[in-house]
């Protein structure tokens, strides 16, 4: 490593990138929550909260970009307050943490990984809902889906997952 950066923390950048991932097995119910939207499905997910893999991965991406741990540290599954909780509460909390540190979401790129349900009819509602939670324009939020081509637990219809990448930028543009 160059002596130039040895022992220094890189805090002077005006952008940061975070990546999040979440996965849940299917369980009894008639819907799944995805991107804050109730999507009818033959089953739900096994989770402590509402099990929204997109919003959980979004929280992890935001927290990771700030170096603030993960969703489990902020909302432990052992805490009964979060039993069945709306994952939008988690996203609003993470957004508050960003704002308190003078950061803002620049854009979100979310991918649901599932064989079913098909999410195309719900994508615009997801984008708009996530944008409201983050206080950004819907154009700053991308939501899409892919399958696992029949491979693994997702391919067997046993669950679903999501990956989210988030770009943060400084609200005031000041380098610290």
Swiss-Prot record:
Q: Where are the transmembrane segments?
A: none
Where, by residue number, does 4-CDP-2-C-methyl-D-erythritol 2-phosphate bind?
22-24, 48-49, 70-72, 146-149, 153, 156
Q: Which GO terms describe its biological process?
A: isopentenyl diphosphate biosynthetic process, methylerythritol 4-phosphate pathway; terpenoid biosynthetic process
> InterPro entries in the record, alphabetically?
MECDP_synthase, MECDP_synthase_CS, MECDP_synthase_sf
For a divalent metal cation, which residues are the binding ones? 22, 24, 56
Cofactor detail note: Binds 1 divalent metal cation per subunit.
Which residue positions does the secretion signal occupy?
A: none
Keywords assigned by UniProt, alphabetized: Isoprene biosynthesis, Lyase, Metal-binding
Give the EC number(s) listed in the UniProt record.
4.6.1.12
Q: Which Pfam families match?
A: YgbB
Q: Where is this site: Transition state stabilizer?
A: 48, 147
Q: Which reaction does it catalyse?
A: 4-CDP-2-C-methyl-D-erythritol 2-phosphate = 2-C-methyl-D-erythritol 2,4-cyclic diphosphate + CMP
Named from the GO MF annotations, one term is: 2-C-methyl-D-erythritol 2,4-cyclodiphosphate synthase activity
Name the cofactor(s) required for activity, per the record: a divalent metal cation
What does the function comment of this entry state?
Answer: Involved in the biosynthesis of isopentenyl diphosphate (IPP) and dimethylallyl diphosphate (DMAPP), two major building blocks of isoprenoid compounds. Catalyzes the conversion of 4-diphosphocytidyl-2-C-methyl-D-erythritol 2-phosphate (CDP-ME2P) to 2-C-methyl-D-erythritol 2,4-cyclodiphosphate (ME-CPP) with a corresponding release of cytidine 5-monophosphate (CMP).
On assembly, the entry states: Homotrimer.
State what protein this is by name.
2-C-methyl-D-erythritol 2,4-cyclodiphosphate synthase
Q: Which organism is it from?
A: Xylella fastidiosa (strain Temecula1 / ATCC 700964)
């Amino acid at each position: 490593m160059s002596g130039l950066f040895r022992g220094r923390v890189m805090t002077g950048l005006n952008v940061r990138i975070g990546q999040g991932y979440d996965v849940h097995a299917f369980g009894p119910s008639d819907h799944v929550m995805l991107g804050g939207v109730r999507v009818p499905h033959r089953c739900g997910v096994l989770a402590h909260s509402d099990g929204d893999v997109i919003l959980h991965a979004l929280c992890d991406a935001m927290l990771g970009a700030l170096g603030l741990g993960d969703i489990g540290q902020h909302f432990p599954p052992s805490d009964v307050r979060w039993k069945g909780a709306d994952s939008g509460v988690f996203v609003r909390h993470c957004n508050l943490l960003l704002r308190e540190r003078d950061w803002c979401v620049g854009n979100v790129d979310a991918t649901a990984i599932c064989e079913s349900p098909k999410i195309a009819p719900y994508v615009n509602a997801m984008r708009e809902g996530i944008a409201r939670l983050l206080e950004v324009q819907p154009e700053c939020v991308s939501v899409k889906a892919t399958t696992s081509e029949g491979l693994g637990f997702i391919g067997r219809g046993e669950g679903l997952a999501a990956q989210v990448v988030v770009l943060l930028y400084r609200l005031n543009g000041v380098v610290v």
